[in-house]
Amino acid sequence: MEFDKLYRQYDYLKKLKSVLYYQGAVTHEILGNLTEILKDRITNQKGKNKILNVFVEMVQNVSHYSLEKEGSYGIGLILVKEKNHILKLSTANLLSEETASTLEKKLDHFLSLSEAEVKELYLQKIKGERPKSSKGAGLGFLEILRKSDFPFRSSFEKTPNGNFFFTLTVFFRLE
């Protein structure tokens, strides 16, 4: 029985053309190891640094903000796929209703901004104080938006227990 489940998962991930798949706690060591794996798999030398920077930012968000924890580390899912010369980075984790609501408004606002407005807001945040609720400088999603080749996509799906399953997907050209 276990074989059937594993084979179905294997076959599914193979069809997805996944480059990297991880589900579990995101420790500093795991982040470092996943980054090294991705670094070895990216053949586009020109865009490698920005892809890796965005990947690290996305995975740190899972570690810091996931509602599910293993010790002090967040639990989530990380998936990297490649198709038609596009690299797709996706992360997913659970959020509380309050966090999901706040984050959804923030991301919608960021996506409504022009490139110049994103740059201006980014510079303001660099010069400003660190937000109290942030584990960083509050720049993460702006960094992701600035460095990715296309606008990111996000979704917030309510789970049966009232929390939200948050997914973030970012795209890069590989040519």
Where are these regions (language model features)?
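Conserved short strand/loop->alpha-helix "switch" segment adjacent to the catalytic nucleotide/phosphoryl-transfer site
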Residues: 34-56, 129-134
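STAS-typified acidic loop motif
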Residues: 18-32
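Short, glycine/charge-rich beta-strand/loop segments that flank catalytic centers
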Residues: 54-57, 75-77
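Conserved beta-strand-loop-beta-strand hairpin that lines the nucleotide-binding pocket
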Residues: 3-20, 65-175
